[in-house]
Amino acid sequence: MFSLPNCFARSVACLLLVLSPLVCHAEAGVSANRILLGQSAAFSGPAAQLGIDLNAGARLYFDQVNRQGGIHGRKIEIITADDKYEPALTVENTRRLIQNDQVFALFGYVGTPTSNAALPVFTSARVPFFAPFTGALSLREPFNRQIFHIRAGYVEETEHLVDQLARVGIRNIAAFHQNDAYGQAGLDGVQRALRKRNMTLADSATVERNSNNVSQAAQRLLTKRPDAIIQISTYAASAALIKQMRAAGYTGQFHNVSFVGSQPLAQALGPDGQGVGVSQVVPFPWKASNPVVAEYARALKNDGKGEPNFSSLEGYIAAKVFAEGLRRAGADLTREKFIAALETITLKNYDIGFPVEFSPTRHTGSTFVDMTVITKNEKFLN
């Protein structure tokens, strides 16, 4: 006997069977017209300028892409969450971004302790973790398929710094480092570079994360009077130490790794900044002959987004490489296809003026390190 309800039920069942592949293949954070990214970073507190600048550079590039219709018809959006450079907040933000906001990928996290804290969360969820603003070995070894770096590691940066000092005969070197995973990662790199040259660290002193209380560190280092101090901290604490030691008559050299935040450091130091060194992991932002730098400078000018700086250039490059991965992944976007697409980027098939190369067994995209020195009026010499 014909039954309308039964017929309707069978029709619905058939429809679900037809649609089920589409439902099953829908990826989190991906819709017909949007790709959603999540970024937890310091947007307030002593390290805020790092998150602000990195995000500004990324948005500068993504806005260009979106004005041109996006990638495969999808525009890129970033949800930001302020973690104040605190690991516990980063974990909360990461869980919310993945579980509640359903982001496609995590982008531009700032810091070693914060990224380390998020590591088990995004790894278990198998969410891509792209371009963290850190050079720590803990996020590079052992290999993690979800993580992609576009910056050199602290091993490369500190090797470059120690090499530059050793070449000019400076062997009495001390370290000032943040008392956490970031500081330890940088300190390990310094000691590794010194051992390579049969040198030993003259002394070290610490500062707590998100603190500018450097009085004890300054006193300790002043007693040893090293010829040079390598700093592994953020701009506020590094500037505080330099100012206190200069005021006490210290005339040795100060050198920082790129994470310090170059422009905020120069601004915080004022006249005391002259001669302070900073290693860099992106090209000089005022080098007009470099293709990606020239493109970045034009975008800043066209959008009226202020002056160039190292951190926003890093965000711009990160966004550009991320977008290249999306293009290569194709219109049927999934996280797995995105990861596989990024792994096809090589120096031979992707030349933007900054060396980036991935493979299925190597997700550290660059080992590029350069040196800069702060000059008068908070400018930089390359």
Tell me the role of every PLM-derived stretch.
Residues 1-36:
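Short, low-complexity disordered leader/linker segments with a strong preference
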Residues 30, 34-36, 49-56, 64, ...:
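Beta-alpha junction/loop-to-helix N-cap segments that form part of ligand/metal-binding clefts
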Residues 33-35, 73-76, 100-105, 124-128, ...:
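Loop/turn elements at helix/coil->beta-strand transitions in domains of secreted/extracellular proteins
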Residues 50-67, 89, 129, 157-160, ...:
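Short, solvent-exposed amphipathic alpha-helices that sit
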Residues 92, 136-138, 145-249, 284-294, ...:
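Extracellular/periplasmic Venus flytrap/periplasmic-binding protein
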Residues 97-110, 130-132, 174-177, 225-234, ...:
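Periplasmic-binding protein-like
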Residues 242-315, 375-381:
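Extracellular/periplasmic periplasmic-binding protein-like sensory domains
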Residues 302-312, 323-380:
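Segments of small-molecule ligand-sensing domains
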